[in-house]
Amino acid sequence: MDDAPRLVFYFDYVDPGSYLMHRQLGQLLPDGVEATVHPLEVRPVPQELIDGMDPDWTAYGRTVEGLAREAEIRMAHPTFVPWSRKAHELRLHAAEQGLESPMHAEIFSAHFQEGADIGRIDILVAAAERVGLDASESKAVLDVDKHRDRVVDL
């Protein structure tokens, strides 16, 4: 049994606070403490998408952006907030291929640095290719909802 301390981090790829935590996690963890990440959809399908211009959402984003600036982390405030289930599914696929960490970082970067719509399969497949995953296999995995239940159940 592994007795190493473990931090469990629930996150969503469209949540500004999750992005900031992702960027700072390595620096914040004491030696010997590992982090486990679990998907948590802010707005799961079929709920309405978050209105990226909603005053409460915008205020939250601006607060996180201020904290990011203090930490010298560049961060955009995307005005479109897509559903994120497919992005979570792609991370789980990447984990099976030994590429979870780079895929996790790439998805966050695509949304919060490039402003990409990470709810689109073509955008996610391009991100998968950038980290070394096979495009056809990644698209097939996303098309058939292979990891849907794992995202919903986690």
Regions picked out by a protein language model, each given a short descriptive name:
Residues 2-33, 37, 106-154:
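C-terminal cap of thioredoxin/glutaredoxin-like
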Residues 17-114:
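Structural alpha/beta surface segment adjacent to cysteine/selenocysteine redox centers
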